[in-house]
Structures are given as C-alpha cells and as structure tokens.
C-alpha cells in the first residue's frame, strides 16, 4: 500500500477538473435563480398599490409600498442585490472557463455574504410589516389592514417569498464557493 503513491490525497486528474467545472456551472445556475428571486421581489413590491373607496368615489384610501419606509428599504435592498448578482454573472462564467481562479472567488464570497446580510435584513423587516398588516397589534392600537386591502397584502406577502428564496440560494452560493475554494 505504501508503494502505490496514494496517501489519502484527492486526485487532481480529469475527474477532479470535471467536478470543479460542475461546481462552477452550479454557481452560475444559483446566481441566475437568485437574480430572478431578488428582481421579482423588488418588482412585485415596487408595483404594489391598491385604492379603496371610502363612502363615495371622491374619498378614497390608497395604499402603496412607499407609504411604509420598511417596504421601500425592501425594494431598494432587493434591487441592489439583484444588480450585484447580475454584475457577478460574467465572473461566474469566467470561473467555468478558468475553474482554478482563487482570488476572484474570494471576492465573490465576500460580496455574496454582504448581499446575504442585506437581503436578510430586508426580508426580515418586510416580514415584520407584513405580519403587522395581517394581524395588527392590539396593544399599540394598530389594526390589521389586510381585511380591507387584500390585494395589496397578497402582493407584499408574495414578494417576501422571492426574497426568502433568494436568501436560501445566497447561502447555497456561499457554501458552494467555500467548497470550490477548499478543493484547490
């Protein structure tokens, strides 16, 4: 066994190169999925509004995402994350071609972690507002608005799904990049 030259090291042959390329392709796919999640969330939230007449057509209540600063933060944060992910796509393609690139992958991990923090903060803040919109808070005399603005609440709830999905994909991206770096 000692003369065979194998001492528990992984082979750097064609199989290892194929696995590295597969990880890079998976990285690209995850980035595209994260772009879709963050962009769809930002668009869904940013285009959400509902008008409800109050007694007559002349007196109306209008609810928009921009009425709540937390939801504005949600749109901006998801837009920033989406822009970053779009900008990172060419670098991810470079990793498919040159899977041995190390420093660019470190840079991507750093910014992926920053975007994960941003999307997590936005999704969490948005979830808190959506919870209040659905349930209200009796002790603070905040009434649930989703009984009146049901379309508005459905859209903002739906936009949270894309953002939380993007969070999961960003976590997978970070883990995938760490595995790819560990294989070097």
UniProtKB/Swiss-Prot annotation:
GO terms for biological process: cell wall organization. The chain crosses the membrane at residues 23-43, 73-93, 106-126, 160-180. Residues 44-72, 127-159 are extracellular. Residues 1-22, 94-105, 181-184 are cytoplasmic. It holds the Pfam family CASP_dom. Keywords: Cell membrane, Cell wall biogenesis/degradation, Glycoprotein, Membrane, Transmembrane, Transmembrane helix. InterPro entries: CASP/CASPL, CASP_dom, CASPL. Homodimer and heterodimers. PANTHER family: CASP-LIKE PROTEIN, CASP-LIKE PROTEIN 1U1. This is Casparian strip membrane protein 3. It comes from Brachypodium distachyon. The lineage of its organism: Eukaryota, Viridiplantae, Streptophyta, Embryophyta, Tracheophyta.
């Amino acid at each position: 066994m000692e003369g065979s030259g194998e001492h528990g090291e992984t082979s750097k042959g064609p199989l290892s190169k194929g696995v590295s390329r597969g990880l890079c392709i998976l990285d690209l796919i995850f980035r595209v999925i994260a772009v879709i999640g963050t962009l769809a969330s930002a668009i869904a939230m940013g285009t959400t509004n509902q008008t409800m007449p109050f007694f007559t057509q002349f007196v109306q209540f209008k609810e928009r995402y921009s009425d709540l600063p937390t939801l504005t933060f949600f749109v901006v944060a998801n837009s920033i994350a989406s822009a970053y992910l779009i900008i990172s796509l060419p670098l991810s393609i470079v990793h498919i071609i040159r899977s041995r690139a190390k420093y660019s992958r470190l840079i991507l991990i750093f910014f992926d972690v920053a975007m994960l923090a941003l999307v997590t903060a936005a999704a969490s803040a948005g979830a808190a507002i959506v919870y209040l919109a659905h349930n209200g808070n009796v002790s603070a005399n905040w009434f649930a608005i989703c009984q009146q603005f049901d379309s508005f609440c459905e859209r903002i709830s739906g936009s949270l799904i894309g953002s939380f999905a993007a969070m999961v994909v960003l976590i997978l991206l970070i883990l995938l990049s760490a595995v790819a770096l560990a294989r070097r």
